Amino acid sequence: MGQKTALGSLLKSIGNSGQGKVVAGWGAVPVMAFIGVLLLVFLVILLQIYNQSLLLQGFSVDWNGVK
């Protein structure tokens, strides 16, 4: 059997504390929805920069150099 350490006991108590439990109600859905919206906004901004429909002053996009 392995040796018990203070760090191992601490990590075990943190890691297994919520295993198998389901949070009642909405849980983490609002947090995940917010993160999803942020990701969507980020992707739309990238698409607009790629299509040059988002005009940025002093920033030129040259995709010919990217290979």
Swiss-Prot record:
The keyword Protease does not apply. It is found in: Cellular thylakoid membrane. GO terms for biological process: photosynthesis; protein stabilization. Keywords: Membrane, Photosynthesis, Photosystem II, Thylakoid, Transmembrane, Transmembrane helix. SUPFAM superfamilies: Photosystem II 10 kDa phosphoprotein PsbH (SSF161025). It comes from the Bacteria. It is a single-pass membrane protein. One of its GO terms (molecular function) is phosphate ion binding. The chain crosses the membrane at residues 27-47. The keyword Transmembrane helix applies. NCBIfam families: PRK02624.1. Belongs to the PsbH family. PANTHER family: PHOTOSYSTEM II REACTION CENTER PROTEIN H (PTHR34469:SF4). PSII is composed of 1 copy each of membrane proteins PsbA, PsbB, PsbC, PsbD, PsbE, PsbF, PsbH, PsbI, PsbJ, PsbK, PsbL, PsbM, PsbT, PsbX, PsbY, Psb30/Ycf12, peripheral proteins PsbO, CyanoQ (PsbQ), PsbU, PsbV and a large number of cofactors. It forms dimeric complexes. One of the components of the core complex of photosystem II (PSII), required for its stability and/or assembly. PSII is a light-driven water:plastoquinone oxidoreductase that uses light energy to abstract electrons from H(2)O, generating O(2) and a proton gradient subsequently used for ATP formation. It consists of a core antenna complex that captures photons, and an electron transfer chain that converts photonic excitation into a charge separation. This is Photosystem II reaction center protein H. It comes from Prochlorococcus marinus (strain MIT 9211). The lineage of its organism: Bacteria, Bacillati, Cyanobacteriota, Cyanophyceae, Synechococcales. The gene is psbH.
